[in-house]
């Protein structure tokens, strides 16, 4: 019988641990962890990374998308020195306009306040996928600047010459000395402005050192680049005209790392290591993700919105399973994917994407069924009415956590510019907060008992079946997975 776990039982009790700890590691591929460490021997393990020490009392977890929205608006209203908001997009809808109006109101009340928004260059200048063609959110930015003044800079950040090949995916809002870290962007569903919402993780951290460190990449590396241009003032150059600048900018980002003064973690404190990454070579965030998984001894929780694990992550998870580690993967059901189209609605090609992810998950579960049956691998699918799922990150044993916008998929691994915060908690000061967060997430999940709990391709809508078969026939499914 497959046991069902809440957050506390998952962390407090593992029926496999006593027997697995008494046995030597499996002989299957016994040198995988050793090979990884040998190849990356210059890379420090998570516990040895330099960190910014902060009081555990200055770290809090917000519970809902509404909390995220209300906290953001309150912080904007109170800010006295700076507001720097990086997001994939700030949408032209009620939620996005509410945030932008709050920024203009704060600037009017305190003219000395420095306010800048950073969005992806390409995403800001196109309409929504699957919708009618439009000039994108940049039209709203210019309209509000003409009406309310140009005191707010909204920068378009081009990571690549084409959106398909990479986007600006940096997270972490900086408001004075506070960092509001979430994978969420700024629109109706992320902010739960109306009835539907898109759930994410939301963390509030008060630290001048962390805020300064994360602000530097925005106010210097981004804003001062010749590839980055304001979208709400003056004329906007064509992407082709800044081609060389974009290439140089991406090259600089691939070498970038956060700079900060590290200090020792004292009683009552946790350590936070900000990480930055772009591309597959020298990517510190990617390395940290794999290192954290390999470091897991007893329990690993992995959040991902789209099941399409990069090869290094999949191999690390398999290694931990073979060595007795208890693994929980929490992801969205295909109906909780933002590209899901109900069978009752007209089908569009983009609607096949959630089914491709589910097919990946089905293959993954089928080949690891023995771990699922033993209760060692727990797969939880999130679904709540017609809302959507966007969580990502890691919880490792009781000492480490990762907050990130990285979807832990090949696209994030290779193409997009990402960041994250590695939390080192040697005194377990945040454990109860992590457990409470996990319980809230699991409340709307169902646990898979077998790969057969998932739909097979034969039950998919006919247009989806045709697309998947066509991709498989020319072996394009693997290529598609690299950019999803």
Listing of model-derived features with the role each one plays in the protein:
Residues 114-115, 299, 322-328:
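Residues at the starts of beta-strands that form the adenosine-phosphate
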């Amino acid at each position: 019988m497959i046991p069902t776990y809440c957050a506390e039982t998952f962390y407090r009790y593992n029926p496999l641990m006593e027997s697995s700890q008494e046995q030597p590691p499996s002989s299957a591929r016994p040198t995988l962890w050793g090979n990884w460490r040998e190849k990356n021997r210059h890379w420090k393990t998570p516990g040895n990374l330099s960190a910014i020490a902060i009081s555990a009392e200055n770290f809090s977890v917000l519970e809902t998308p509404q909390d995220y929205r209300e906290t953001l608006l309150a912080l904007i209203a109170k800010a006295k020195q700076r507001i720097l908001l990086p997001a994939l997009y700030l949408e032209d809808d009620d939620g996005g306009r509410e945030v932008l109006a709050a920024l203009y109101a704060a600037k009017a009340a305190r003219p000395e306040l420095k306010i800048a928004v950073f969005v992806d260059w390409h995403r800001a200048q196109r309409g929504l996928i699957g919708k009618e063609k439009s000039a994108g959110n940049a039209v709203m930015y210019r309209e509000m600047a003409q009406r309310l003044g140009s005191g707010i800079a909204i920068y378009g950040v081009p990571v690549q010459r084409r959106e398909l090949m990479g986007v600006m995916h940096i997270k972490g809002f900086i408001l004075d000395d506070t960092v509001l870290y979430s994978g969420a962007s700024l629109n109706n569903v992320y902010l739960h402005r109306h009835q539907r919402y898109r759930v994410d993780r939301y963390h509030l951290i008060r630290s001048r050192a962390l805020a300064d460190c994360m602000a530097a990449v925005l106010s210097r590396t981004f804003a001062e680049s010749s590839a980055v241009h304001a979208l709400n003032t003056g004329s906007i150059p064509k992407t082709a005209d800044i081609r060389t600048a974009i290439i140089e900018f991406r090259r600089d980002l691939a070498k970038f790392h956060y700079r900060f003064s590290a200090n020792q973690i004292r009683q009552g404190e946790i350590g936070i290591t900000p990480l930055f990454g772009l591309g597959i070579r020298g990517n510190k965030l990617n390395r940290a993700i794999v290192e954290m998984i390999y470091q897991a001894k007893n329990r690993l929780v992995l959040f991902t919105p789209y099941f399409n694990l990069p090869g290094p992550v999949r191999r690390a998870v398999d290694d931990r399973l073979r060595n007795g580690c208890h693994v929980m993967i929490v992801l969205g059901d295909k109906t909780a994917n933002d590209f899901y189209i109900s069978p009752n609605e007209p089908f569009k090609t983009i609607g096949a994407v959630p089914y491709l992810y589910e097919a990946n998950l089905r293959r993954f579960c089928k080949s690891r069924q023995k771990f699922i049956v033993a209760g060692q691998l727990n797969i939880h699918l999130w679904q709540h009415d017609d809302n959507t799922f966007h969580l990502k990150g890691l919880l490792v044993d009781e000492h480490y956590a990762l907050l990130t916008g990285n979807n832990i998929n090949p696209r994030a691994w290779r193409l997009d510019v990402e960041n994250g915060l590695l939390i080192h908690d040697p005194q377990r000061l945040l454990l109860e907060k992590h457990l409470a967060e996990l319980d809230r997430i699991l409340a709307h999940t169902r646990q898979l008992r077998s790969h057969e709990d998932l739909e097979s391709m034969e039950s998919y809508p006919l247009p989806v079946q045709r697309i998947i078969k066509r991709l498989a026939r020319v072996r394009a499914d693997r290529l598609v997975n690299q950019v999803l």
